[in-house]
Structures are given as structure tokens and as C-alpha cells.
């Protein structure tokens, strides 16, 4: 990919105004790759802003540059203005414009600037001028590292860029335990550590900075809302709006909860359903010979990787869960 990465850097160097976008529901990789690229472009002395559909959760707000992110949910006119005036738009960690949300996607698609997709999800939509799509890569943050490494040199790395990319790789690999991790991933991490990344600080900020409400919500979810599907190695956890209100839910409090269900002995696939205003947010995880991306794509308006996918439903929570249960024999027998 060296040639395409060099082409992308050439586009950066001649651009007057660059906008970095990512998907709705920000996670460690979307924040990490966006800020990693943001700090890199700033080192090249180009004008750049980050525009995301919504605000980062609290456990990611400590990142340097996170407060500079313009959230569409807070200031849609500002995001529209930035997109309209951009001559280069990065689409990071998503494969289709609808992943930015039904409102922001219209402004993204109509923007006239050249669009560059860098992503690791399958089935990229045809809406960008330059596409880097590598489903074998563990994270988009690692792809941003490769962009820097193969087109310029790693001397352009500093602790701000490195910390951002480390965050994205760490979170999207489940702290380096998912099958997507390769020897190259560890080589990249070694380079980031040499650049000054304080890896223990990143882990502590993400995983060891809980509020009491967050821990109590997660305990309640496992103790009271966990359900195993009889006859199948499948489990689910569901939370209603009332559950969330009871524990003073804040964005990010349920991050990784679906993995807790998957970690239980004998469970090979898990789903998490969270009731929000007007829709149900769904997360799927699996392991071994059980895949969830087709289920998410075909039945829950979503998609993702074989072992990690997401979706949504506008049906009531109980109806959505019943529909999932009826699909279990087809996908997880």
C-alpha cells in the first residue's frame, strides 16, 4: 500500500482545508485514528479539523485534542460549514456514509471535497475518491500508523500521535487478545512505545476510571438482565431506558458489556440490546466458528466484522429481542 499512502500524503500537502470524519457512536478506534491523523496533519502545517457525528464518551475525553472535535449533535451548522469548505475529507473507520447518522450523512455526501476512506470493515460503499480498505488489519488506527510509516517516516511520530494510535489499537483488539492481532500489530506497538507512549496510563484512563454508577449499572446488567438462550451457546443482555435512568447512565457506561456476556463459560455468541429514544442499539460479539456480521447486516440494519458487529432496530425492545431469539437457530446452531 506504500504508493497509495504516498498519494494520500501528497493530497494532504496540497490541501487548504482538511476535515476528518468518523462514525456515529465513537469508540476508541474512531477517536484514536481521528486524533492520530489530526496531530500528524498539524505537524505538516495544514489546516485540519475533526468533525464527528456525536460527542466522545467520558472515558475517551482525556485524549489530547478530544476537546477540539466538533460534534454534529451539538453544532450541525458548524459541521456543515466545515464540510462545505473542505477540499479534502477523510472518512475513517466506516465503510458507508450512513454510518455517520441519517442527518450528517447528507452533508457528507453533498460535500464537494475529495474524499478518502481509510477503514478495516468489509464491503466498502462507493462514495470516496481514494479507498484504503484492509479487513485483515486489526484497526483503522494501525492503518493510520502504516500511512505515516510507509509514506513519510516514523520520525514524524510523537507521543500525541502515538498515544492516539495506541488507544485505537488497544481498544479495537480487546487489549491485544482478538484474532485480528498479528506480529505486525506488536511491531507497531513497539514503535509507539519508543515514541514515548505511556501504555499503562492509556489503559488506566480507559479501563480503570469508573464511576460508582457505571459499575453498579454493569453489575445489575449481568446479575439481573443476563439471559442464556436454551439449547444454544448464545446469551444476551438488555437494558431499558428505565434501567439506564436508574443508574444515571452516561455515554460509554455500557462499553464492552457485550464482551462480558461473551466471556462466560460456554457462550460463543452474545448480543447486547440498549433502549434509546426512538431506537434500540445492538452490539454483537462472537468467537470460534460463530459469526455475527451477516446477522447484523441482514436483519438489524448494521454490519461489521465476523466476530464484532452492530445494528439497530426501531421496533420495541421486547419485539427486537424476540426477533433475535427466533434467528438464533439459523445462525448459531
Residue ranges and their predicted role:
Residues 2-24, 32-64, 68-70, 77-80, ...:
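Hydrophobic helix-and-loop "lid/oligomerization" segment in the mid-to-C-terminal part
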Residues 83-84, 105-113:
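Short, conserved loop/helix-junction motifs that constitute active-site signature segments
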Residues 63-66, 111, 127-128:
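Short, structured coil segments at secondary-structure junctions
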Residues 28-34, 97-101:
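Short glycine/serine/threonine-rich phosphate/pyrophosphate-binding segments
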Residues 118-188:
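Short alpha-helices
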Residues 49-50, 117-119:
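Short beta-strand "acidic-cap" motif of Rossmann-like dinucleotide-binding folds
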Residues 24-26, 94-97, 121-123, 241-242, ...:
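Short glycine-rich anion-binding loops that position phosphate/pyrophosphate groups of nucleotides
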Residues 88-104, 116, 123:
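Glycine-rich phosphate-binding loops that contact phosphosugars or nucleotide phosphates
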Amino acid at each position: 500500500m506504500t504508493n497509495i499512502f504516498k498519494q494520500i500524503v501528497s493530497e494532504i500537502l496540497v490541501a487548504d482545508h482538511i476535515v476528518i470524519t468518523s462514525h456515529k457512536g465513537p469508540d476508541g478506534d474512531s477517536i484514536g485514528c481521528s486524533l492520530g491523523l489530526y496531530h500528524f496533519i498539524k505537524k505538516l502545517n495544514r489546516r485540519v479539523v475533526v468533525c464527528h457525528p456525536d460527542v466522545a464518551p467520558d472515558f475517551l475525553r482525556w485524549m489530547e485534542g478530544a476537546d477540539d472535535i466538533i460534534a454534529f449533535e451539538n453544532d450541525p451548522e458548524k459541521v456543515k460549514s466545515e464540510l462545505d469548505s473542505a477540499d479534502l475529507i477523510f472518512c475513517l473507520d466506516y465503510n458507508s456514509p450512513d454510518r455517520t447518522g441519517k442527518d450528517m450523512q447528507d452533508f457528507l455526501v453533498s460535500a464537494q471535497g475529495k474524499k478518502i476512506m481509510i477503514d478495516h470493515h468489509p464491503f466498502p460503499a462507493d462514495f470516496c475518491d481514494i479507498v484504503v480498505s484492509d479487513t485483515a488489519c486489526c484497526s483503522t488506527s494501525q492503518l493510520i500508523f502504516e500511512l505515516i510509516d510507509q509514506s513519510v517516516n516514523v520520525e514524524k511520530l510523537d507521543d500525541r500521535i502515538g498515544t492516539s494510535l495506541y488507544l485505537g489499537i488497544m481498544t479495537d483488539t480487546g487489549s491485544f487478545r482478538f484474532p485480528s492481532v498479528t506480529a505486525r500489530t506488536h511491531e507497531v506497538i513497539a514503535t509507539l512505545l519508543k515514541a514515548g507512549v505511556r501504555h499503562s496510563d492509556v489503559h488506566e484512563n480507559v479501563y480503570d476510571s469508573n464511576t460508582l454508577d457505571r459499575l453498579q449499572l454493569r453489575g445489575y446488567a449481568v446479575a439481573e438482565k443476563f439471559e442464556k438462550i436454551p439449547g444454544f451457546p448464545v446469551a444476551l443482555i438488555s437494558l431499558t431506558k428505565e434501567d439506564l435512568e436508574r443508574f444515571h447512565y452516561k455515554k460509554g457506561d455500557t462499553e464492552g458489556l457485550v464482551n462480558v456476556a461473551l466471556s462466560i463459560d460456554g457462550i460463543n455468541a452474545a448480543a447486547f440490546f440498549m433502549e434509546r429514544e426512538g431506537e434500540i442499539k445492538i452490539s454483537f460479539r462472537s468467537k470460534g466458528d460463530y459469526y455475527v456480521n451477516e446477522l447484523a447486516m441482514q436483519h438489524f440494519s448494521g454490519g461489521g466484522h465476523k466476530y464484532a458487529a452492530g445494528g439497530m432496530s426501531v421496533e420495541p425492545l421486547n419485539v427486537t429481542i424476540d426477533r433475535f431469539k427466533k434467528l438464533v437457530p439459523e445462525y448459531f446452531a
